């Protein structure tokens, strides 16, 4: 009759964890019911104790709050509207309705991380219909039910039903890892918090292997790859000339 598990919605996956000894693999909303998808049966009518996979939940909170920071700043700095959001296992995808230059993306990322270090409060409330009518807030949908408003002080006011951190410092950091033009606007890939650390660790492992293979220092890995490409092109041209001479 009640649960602490967040169901899939708004671009965010459902919570995982346990109900007693049974693993919860996913949580979804069906009508007015919250459905827990488990790896084993539970006896109907019995009371169970739920335990969230907190590390996973918190990582998603970091990413979702980080997305609000970026979307709020993109709106205030460049007049962008967030028209798409999807939280994957390793990255978050954001779609904006306007194109942004690499320089603008750098400013956006820098401003977002500055705001995170300021440890601004993140609050959620359910305004009355009268309060909501007078409120300027972001929303990707036409909302007809009770609206939950998540506010990041001095940055963003948005309708959102998902769990969030209590202050921006808990996000840790946000990093834009890729961008492409998309439907007249831009699609961004971002990581935040624990996912940002995991992303950095993977890339550090890769760059260490590449630099070792090329016998260069890590900051010179790109130059080492370019040198290798030029050497390969020279060898191809030499081979072509040799074959023509035979």
Question: Model features per residue range: what roles?
Answer:
Residues 7-11, 60-65, 102-106, 159, ...:
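Ordered, soluble secondary-structure elements with a strong preference for glycine-centered loop motifs
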Residues 31-40, 92-98:
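A generic structural motif
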Residues 11-21, 172-175, 205:
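Extended active-site and interfacial segments that coordinate phosphate-rich ligands
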Residues 56, 79-182:
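Functional cores that coordinate and move charged inorganic groups
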Residues 2, 52, 96-98, 151, ...:
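Flexible glycine-/small-residue-rich
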Residues 21-33:
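Solvent-exposed beta-strand/loop surfaces of large extracellular or lumenal domains
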Residues 4-19, 43-94:
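Active/ligand-binding-proximal structured segments within catalytic/core domains
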């Amino acid at each position: 009759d009640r649960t602490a598990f967040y169901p899939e919605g708004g671009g965010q996956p459902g919570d995982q964890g346990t109900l007693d000894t049974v693993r919860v693999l996913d949580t979804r909303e069906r009508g007015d019911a919250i459905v827990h998808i488990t790896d084993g049966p539970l006896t109907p009518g019995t009371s169970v104790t739920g335990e969230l996979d907190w590390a996973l939940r918190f990582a998603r909170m970091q990413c979702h709050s980080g997305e609000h920071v970026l979307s709020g700043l993109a709106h205030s700095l460049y007049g962008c509207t967030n028209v798409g959001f999807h939280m994957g296992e390793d990255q978050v995808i954001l779609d904006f309705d306007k194109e942004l230059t690499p320089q603008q993306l750098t400013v956006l990322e820098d401003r977002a991380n500055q705001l995170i270090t300021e440890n601004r409060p993140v609050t959620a409330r359910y305004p009355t219909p009268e309060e909501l009518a007078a409120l300027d807030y972001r929303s990707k949908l036409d909302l007809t039910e009770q609206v939950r408003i998540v506010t990041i002080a001095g940055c963003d006011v948005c309708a959102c039903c998902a769990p969030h951190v209590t202050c921006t410092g808990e996000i840790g950091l946000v990093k834009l890892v890729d961008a492409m033009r998309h439907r007249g606007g831009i699609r961004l890939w971002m990581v935040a918090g624990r996912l940002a650390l995991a992303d950095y660790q993977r890339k550090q492992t890769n760059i260490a292997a590449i630099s070792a293979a090329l016998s260069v220092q890590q900051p010179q890995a790109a130059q080492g790859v370019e040198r290798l490409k030029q050497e390969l092109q020279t060898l191809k041209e030499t081979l072509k000339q040799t074959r023509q001479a035979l």
